[in-house]
Amino acid sequence: MRILQVFHDHERGGVQVLAETIEQGLSPHRIGVETTHLFPHPGLPAFSKLICAGRAARYIWRGDFDALVAYQGAASILVGVIGWLRGCRLRIVHQTCTPGATAPLIRWLDKLIGALGLYSVNIANSAATWAEFARYPVSYRRAMILIEHGLDAPAPTRHREEARRRFNLPLSQPLLLNVGRLMAQKNQELLIRALPNLPRAHLVLAGGGLKVDAYRALADTLGVGDRLHILGSLPPGDIADLYLAADLFVFPSTWETFGIAAVEAAMVGMPMVVADLPALREVLRAEGEEPVAFAAPHDVEAWIAAISAALAAPPLPQIAAIFARTIRRRYSRQRMIENYLNLFEREARSGQSEWRRSGVAATAEEVRR
């Protein structure tokens, strides 16, 4: 079986982490996964985007793939239309953005294409995400299913002090960690504005993006430039070490459909302050006490209070350990991959997809090997 995953661009983020996890999980089952991108980088002018989209459409058309998997709105539209015209029977789209945060034209086209039945499977990654589409046409929602993300728990390789030295971070001051692209949605500006009222804390931003210069300038203006550490995009191993090095994970996003970075931090038992969003309340729930505080994503004073309280009273180690085990079990990669294999098996049994593996049609039993 051959699958093509389609992204907007090469910029690393939670969606790329998800796709890599899916690829690694499916490969042992003799499922080949390829990846292509619509655009080489964000911020292209409209005409350049059209040219790039045309190239991606041509690649899809010529590829003769058994399944197409799209992440993000424009990729979903391309997969739905070109995949349907090409006769690819399994056209999977992931809802990685809430409708309210999607550009109006893309939102309208996505709704139209989904309502016309051009998506064969429409995946929501959380119940909160599914609820965002409650007002969409029934014909759109008919293809929706729930497959929660699954991740490998981060595996730090450095001790706390060693990791801090590795990234030139202070050894004895409280470290606040945020992981994610530097963009308006991730709302790191709020954390920088909170720093003047958190006099000992240092803020570590692990991610790249268009806001780097603006965030440095803001920190300098507020007099906290020496306590802001922007490390850029880092490989998973370095991120894992940062989870161990930091004292508190902070995640003030204005919207999330799942929150992969927050779940990763939870998997290592980090105490955290996160935005009070339905998706984050859902994915970070645990039986018993949780080392998680929620704050409104635009209330700087609430974040100052929540961060101060979390630093002053860290959770007991046993509470953090129970929390980590719960999240690891619920969002394991194995569980997610099993859900995808079940999906492919249902499609194989129903005869809706003519899969070829070395020129031979795949049976449902072969999919699970």
Residue ranges and their predicted role:
Residues 16-21, 174-197, 201, 210-216, ...:
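A conserved mid-protein helix/loop that constitutes part of the nucleotide-sugar donor-binding site
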Residues 60, 233-234, 241-246:
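Short alpha-helical donor nucleotide-sugar binding micro-motif in glycosyltransferases
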Residues 70-76, 94-96:
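Short His-centered aromatic/hydrophobic patch
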Residues 156-169, 316:
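A short helix/loop element that forms part of the nucleotide-sugar donor recognition site in Leloir-type
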Residues 216-234:
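Nucleotide-activated donor-binding/catalytic signature segment of Leloir-type glycosyltransferases, i.e.
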Residues 254:
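Aromatic "clamp/platform" in nucleotide-sugar-dependent glycosyltransferases that forms part
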Residues 271-275, 281:
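Short hydrophobic beta-strand element within catalytic cores of glycosyltransferases
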Residues 287-301, 309-314:
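Conserved acidic donor-binding segment of nucleotide-sugar-dependent glycosyltransferases
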